[in-house]
Amino acid sequence: MSVIKEYRTASEVVGPLMIVEQVNNVSYNELVEIQLHNGEIRRGQVLEIHEDKAMVQLFEGSSGINLEKSKIRFAGHALELAVSEDMVGRIFNGMGKPIDGGPDLIPEKYLDIDGQAINPVSRDYPDEFIQTGISSIDHLNTLVRGQKLPVFSGSGLPHNELAAQIARQATVLNSDENFAVVFAAMGITFEEAEFFMEELRKTGAIDRSVLFMNLANDPAIERIATPRIALTAAEYLAFEKDMHVLVIMTDMTNYCEALREVSAARREVPGRRGYPGYLYTNLSTLYERAGRLVGKKGSVTQIPILTMPEDDITHPIPDLTGYITEGQIILSHELYNQGYRPPINVLPSLSRLKDKGSGEGKTRGDHAPTMNQLFAAYAQGKKVEELAVVLGESALSDVDKLYVKFTKRFEEEYINQGFYKNRNIEDTLNLGWELLSILPRTELKRIKDDLLDKYLPLVEV
């Protein structure tokens, strides 16, 4: 049994950091409790150790701390989350404490929030379909169990509504398997938190969800712990309770801002745009916790959501996220301004594992061919629209005009399904065929004749 060590040797507080001197046998990442002169308890984590000095990262901020009268206790273990199957259906704050007025959780065990490194050899390949009910994702950018597929949004775009829609609608097609959603919110406003909770409550989706809410007025440093706490809960449900867990994390930009704040307080040499040079490594410790394990029934799938500062996809946060994850869903200001919801720009969006989750036995045999044909037709239609702007519509051929018609209907009916319409994969595929029937059969060169004969609707000439 570890001995709790208590000190009164705090020498300095700088922003969210505290320096404690004359420490002995203290470990990196060790949990710290600071008892203030008025009895208030605040928590922190050992960030760095040098000789007999420890740098502590404070989760609840440093205001009101009297260095001479504060007692610092090192717990002998890292920050841990109390986990239980009863977490499902509950709402917690960013540090894992219940805030829904329900009873205290009776933990089955305590787990280190940093998780365990997954041996690459023990990973199982993602190859099963997750249905979000959103055509632009299910058909064109298929989400697969165990994948990490981020959403790149911009200022003013409805990524919160998209996140809530996915949390409400996402499911696995085999009804015999348990499915849960873990939702981690970082730096959101009170109104946004109420929106998420109300959306899940009124549809009953709260009963299969675990929510962790870090609000904008909560300490920024808490945001560093929130996604790790959420992923710890997800790993417990997936690998110990055999559930398929979808983790939605929003907004990762706020998480990275908190990292930058700590880095600045430590006076580290800044990297690109002032973010720490280890931003890539730090993000990978979150994103790489998605996946499946050999011999385990459950899976952890991630949808991290981030807002691109100034809509710049080359900004360090989306840039590094794109390197680590397996694709991206990109939201478009142009589609949003035209009234399309959700405004997913399907052409630059990508799911690198989409071919692993589609096909006979997973979705339908015509999934991949129709996906390729829709991409090709939509890209051609956008080119024709640009040509019409330059040369005028009179310069378009009859086939070009059909492509323009296809593009308009594709955006109005396929992309613009709304935030409250849940389309199953059958309905999505059938809608794709209906739109492709606008074009002459000779233009559908990416689909084999047997599939055209089977699915292409008869069109009156």
UniProtKB/Swiss-Prot annotation:
<keyword id="KW-0375">Hydrogen ion transport</keyword>
<dbReference type="InterPro" id="IPR027417">
    <property type="entry name" value="P-loop_NTPase"/>
</dbReference>
<dbReference type="GO" id="GO:0042777">
    <property type="term" value="P:proton motive force-driven plasma membrane ATP synthesis"/>
</dbReference>
<protein>
    <recommendedName>
        <fullName>V-type ATP synthase beta chain</fullName>
    </recommendedName>
</protein>
<dbReference type="InterPro" id="IPR020003">
    <property type="entry name" value="ATPase_a/bsu_AS"/>
</dbReference>
<dbReference type="Pfam" id="PF00006">
    <property type="entry name" value="ATP-synt_ab"/>
</dbReference>
<dbReference type="GO" id="GO:0005524">
    <property type="term" value="F:ATP binding"/>
</dbReference>
<dbReference type="GO" id="GO:0046933">
    <property type="term" value="F:proton-transporting ATP synthase activity, rotational mechanism"/>
</dbReference>
<dbReference type="Pfam" id="PF02874">
    <property type="entry name" value="ATP-synt_ab_N"/>
</dbReference>
<dbReference type="InterPro" id="IPR000194">
    <property type="entry name" value="ATPase_F1/V1/A1_a/bsu_nucl-bd"/>
</dbReference>
<keyword id="KW-0406">Ion transport</keyword>
<comment type="function">
    <text>Produces ATP from ADP in the presence of a proton gradient across the membrane. The V-type beta chain is a regulatory subunit.</text>
</comment>
<keyword id="KW-0066">ATP synthesis</keyword>
<dbReference type="InterPro" id="IPR004100">
    <property type="entry name" value="ATPase_F1/V1/A1_a/bsu_N"/>
</dbReference>
<dbReference type="InterPro" id="IPR022879">
    <property type="entry name" value="V-ATPase_su_B/beta"/>
</dbReference>
<dbReference type="InterPro" id="IPR055190">
    <property type="entry name" value="ATP-synt_VA_C"/>
</dbReference>
<comment type="similarity">
    <text>Belongs to the ATPase alpha/beta chains family.</text>
</comment>
<dbReference type="Pfam" id="PF22919">
    <property type="entry name" value="ATP-synt_VA_C"/>
</dbReference>
<keyword id="KW-0813">Transport</keyword>
